[in-house]
């Protein structure tokens, strides 16, 4: 055991704010299931200004980091290499430390989104809608670039956000049309709707959900279910939640950081559900 502990066995999630993060619950559940009793997974409040110093202070015991806002772009200059997936959206949520000391960045949000959708039977769609703009919305576009064969409509609040989303569409090879947020209820005509906005933002839209809608992917996990997700399910639609995304992206992180595959998806999901239920 002593020789194992001398190797890479530490990981953590960084961000600001970070107290609410479920990542420690998910990763620790994976370690327990995999028999990695000597592995540790922590949580650190780190903002953009503090990130370089934090990274510089890490030693050879560290296997990897999970990153949340506002660090997903700030970390990129501090890395030795970045995966094509992360580079495509200029966002890194996973850092893996190799045996030779290199720091490689990846984005598991995008394949995590795809895995969560496929788990609910969504393999390909003719069109899709995205509610909101920003880092999560750009990841949604990257995921849609692989499963949407038609147009994506993004509902946003400003001309600047509209231009940003169209720019991401061009970069990712997705046909993106933008519409004003005041018309967001029209999104529900699409077979797949991805809601990427903060808690409460879509509550007023719940009354507009039609009977037998398609699939809603609401990236929030707390509070859950959201008002929109509740209405969607009540009207016969399929719902994919933020915990689904969180678990699937964490599975990929565990596999990269520990070198063990497959990670215990169901044990991690159960731990996440229990943690949310106790809050």
Predicted regions and their residues:
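Phosphate/diphosphate ligand-binding glycine-rich loop within oxidoreductases
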Residues: 2-120, 223
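Short, conserved loop/helix-junction motifs that constitute active-site signature segments
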Residues: 4-5, 122-124, 146-148, 207-214
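Glycine-rich adenosine-cofactor-binding loop
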Residues: 15, 107-110, 117-146, 156-157
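Short, charged/polar "capping" segments at the starts of alpha-helices
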Residues: 74, 159-165, 204, 224-227
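NAD(P)-binding Rossmann-fold cofactor-contacting core
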Residues: 149-172
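Rossmann-like adenosine-cofactor binding region
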Residues: 170-240
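Adenosine-phosphate binding glycine-rich loop
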Residues: 219-279
């Amino acid at each position: 055991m002593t020789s194992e502990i001398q190797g890479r066995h530490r990981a953590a999630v960084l961000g600001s704010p970070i107290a609410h993060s479920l990542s420690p619950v998910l990763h620790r559940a994976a370690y327990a299931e995999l028999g990695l009793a000597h592995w540790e997974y922590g949580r650190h409040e780190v903002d953009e200004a503090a990130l370089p110093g934090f990274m510089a202070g890490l030693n050879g015991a560290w296997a990897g980091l999970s990153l949340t806002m506002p660090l997903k772009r700030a970390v990129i200059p501090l890395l030795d290499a970045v995966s094509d997936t992360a580079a495509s959206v200029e966002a890194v949520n996973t850092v893996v430390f190799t045996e030779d000391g290199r720091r490689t960045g990846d984005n598991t949000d995008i394949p995590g989104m795809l895995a969560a959708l496929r788990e609910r039977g969504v393999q390909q769609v003719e069109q899709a809608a995205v509610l909101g703009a920003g880092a999560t919305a750009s990841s949604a576009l990257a995921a849609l670039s692989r499963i949407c064969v038609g147009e994506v409509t993004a509902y946003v609040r400003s001309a600047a956000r509209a231009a940003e989303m169209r720019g991401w569409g061009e970069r990712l090879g997705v046909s993106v049309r933008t519409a004003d947020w005041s018309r967001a209820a029209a999104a529900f005509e699409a077979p797949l709707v991805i809601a990427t906005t903060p808690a409460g933002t879509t509550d007023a839209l719940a009354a507009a959900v039609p009977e037998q809608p398609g699939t809603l992917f609401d990236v929030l996990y707390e509070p859950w279910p959201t008002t929109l997700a509740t209405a969607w399910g009540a009207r016969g639609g399929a719902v994919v939640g933020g915990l689904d995304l969180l678990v699937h992206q964490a599975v990929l992180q565990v596999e990269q950081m520990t070198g063990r595959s497959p990670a215990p998806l169901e044990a991690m999901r159960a731990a996440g559900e229990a943690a949310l239920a106790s809050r």
